[in-house]
Curated annotation (Swiss-Prot):
Pfam families: Dala_Dala_lig_C (PF07478), Dala_Dala_lig_N (PF01820). Cell wall formation. ATP binds at residues 171-226. Binds 2 magnesium or manganese ions per subunit. Mg(2+) 1 binds at residues 297, 311. Its main location: cytoplasm. It is found in: Cytoplasm. Residues 135-344 form the ATP-grasp domain. Mg(2+) 2 binds at residues 311, 313. NCBIfam families: D_ala_D_alaTIGR (TIGR01205), PRK01372.1 (NF002378), PRK01966.1-4 (NF002528). This is D-alanine--D-alanine ligase.
Length: 351
């Protein structure tokens, strides 16, 4: 049987470019482990920070080094020129995080190519990226969430008479502390925890510079726990993991600085809470029309035994030390087998 050619697509234009390189390197290693070399050949395809696609030795070198290529602004012609290796791909494994990678835009392009790909489609990716659309989907599915308010940039920037009223509403409905989040950025980029009116005004202005849509959530004193989901129509949930960190909240620095955050797998939780979180993770996955993989994040309030869904990540970090593969390793699915299963799920979904 001929080996499948896996297009490992990495890099991208978002601020999570470097995270993507590390994820891709780990996946490439997994594709060269166990029985995978008998099944798959890797075609590395690197998207530079300017959006230009590279293949061959250039892409392989970036994959080996996990360091981005320097680049200049690209022309329209360069952006619409794909390497010839693209036509050789049997199945895509896109591992681009953030905007233009996991928000449905790339998934739309791969759908037009009529080639199967790992992960959610256009709808699941788009809903899973936009925190406001995601919350609406969760609400429709009856999943408990913390209180929130959704606003847009125009409410913050357009009229000096409107902005104070907006801040009044946030204070009255949510109180302090609360979190201000751009709706469409990953890795906690642009998120601020605020405790006063002045901090709120500053955080809203900052979030509006990142995104047109902004969500403000009430703060809760809770443990942050995560569950991995794997599958298509009949997904499975992993054991639960917990994140603890040495910062005010789980921000970008805490996520990507060694020693600032610790993963506890499995999390020490009552059995009933574990089952509840696993069930909610699968419900959330189905609510956004997920496929292949997702990591679902929760708040567990120990005092009241309440569980609130925080968000879903349809293309989570995939380094050997990332939460998603670690959760499956603890559940009994090692890294190389996990990568194989994801490729098979992509092929199954295309049939």
């Amino acid at each position: 049987m001929a080996k499948l050619r896996v297009g490992l697509l990495f890099g991208g234009r978002s601020g999570e470019h470097e995270v993507s390189l590390n994820s891709a390197k780990a996946i490439a290693t997994a594709l060269q482990s166990g029985e995978n070399p008998q099944k798959y050949d890797i075609i590395p395809i690197y998207i530079q920070k300017n959006g230009v696609w590279q293949a061959g030795d250039t892409a392989q070198q970036v994959l080996n080094d996990a360091k981005p290529l320097p680049c200049e602004d690209a022309t329209s012609q360069q952006l619409w020129t794909f390497p010839p290796q693209v036509s050789e791909v049997d199945v895509w494994f896109p591992i681009l995080h953030g905007p233009n990678g996991e928000d449905g835009t790339l998934q739309g392009l791969l759908t037009l190519m009529q080639t199967p790909f790992v992960g959610s489609g256009v709808l699941g990716s788009a809903v899973g990226m936009d925190k406001i659309a995601m919350k609406m989907a969760f609400a429709q599915a009856g999943l408990p969430q913390v209180k929130y308010i959704a606003v847009d940039r125009a409410q913050i920037w357009s009229n000096p008479c409107v902005f104070p009223k907006l801040c009044d509403e946030i204070e009255q409905r949510l109180g302090y502390p609360c979190f201000v989040k751009p709706a469409n950025l990953g890795s906690s980029v642009g998120i601020a925890k605020v405790r006063s009116r002045s901090e709120l005004e500053k955080a809203l202005d900052s979030a509006a510079s990142y995104d047109r849509r902004i969500v403000i959530e009430t703060g809760v004193k809770a443990r942050e726990v995560e569950c991995a989901v794997l599958g298509n129509e009949n997904p499975k949930a992993s054991v639960i993991g917990e994140i603890t960190y040495n910062s005010d909240f789980y921000d970008y620095e805490a996520k990507y600085t060694d020693g600032m955050a610790q993963m506890h797998i499995p999390a020490q939780l009552p059995d009933a809470i574990v089952t509840q979180i696993q069930d909610m993770a699968i419900q959330a996955f189905k609510a956004v029309d997920g496929a292949g993989l997702a990591r679902v994040d929760f708040f567990y309030v120990e005092d009241s035994q309440e569980v609130f869904i925080n968000e879903i990540n349809t293309l989570p970090g995939f380094t050997a030390f990332s939460m998603y593969p670690q959760l499956w390793k603890e559940t009994g699915v090692p890294f190389a087998e996990l990568v194989d299963q994801l490729i098979q799920l992509a092929l199954e979904r295309k049939q």
